[in-house]
Amino acid sequence: MAKEKATLPPTGAGLMRFFDEDTRAVKVSPKGVIALTLLLIAFEFILHMFGSSIFG
């Protein structure tokens, strides 16, 4: 007697869509994000060191 095939439940493939290529957002590379973060850290450090003398 042959074994019966086990049937798997439906996975729902195709029910959800991810729109990766259809975006209107500003695209920033990972290097750009790191550079902007480092610039922000440097700016805050400079403000911490010299801000009281500059802004009174």
UniProtKB/Swiss-Prot annotation:
Residues 1-29 are cytoplasmic. It comes from the Archaea. GO terms for biological process: protein transport. It is found in: Cell membrane. The chain crosses the membrane at residues 30-49. Its main location: membrane. Pfam families: Sec61_beta. Keywords: Cell membrane, Membrane, Protein transport, Translocation, Transmembrane, Transmembrane helix, Transport. InterPro entries: Preprot_translocase_SecG, SecG/Sec61-beta/Sbh. The keyword Cell division does not apply. Residues 50-56 are extracellular. It is a single-pass membrane protein. One of its GO terms (cellular component) is plasma membrane. The keyword NAD does not apply. Involved in protein export. The function of the beta subunit is unknown, but it may be involved in stabilization of the trimeric complex. Component of the protein translocase complex. Heterotrimer consisting of alpha (SecY), beta (SecG) and gamma (SecE) subunits. Can form oligomers of the heterotrimer. Belongs to the SEC61-beta family. This is Preprotein translocase subunit SecG. The lineage of its organism: Archaea, Methanobacteriati, Methanobacteriota, Thermococci, Thermococcales. The gene is secG.
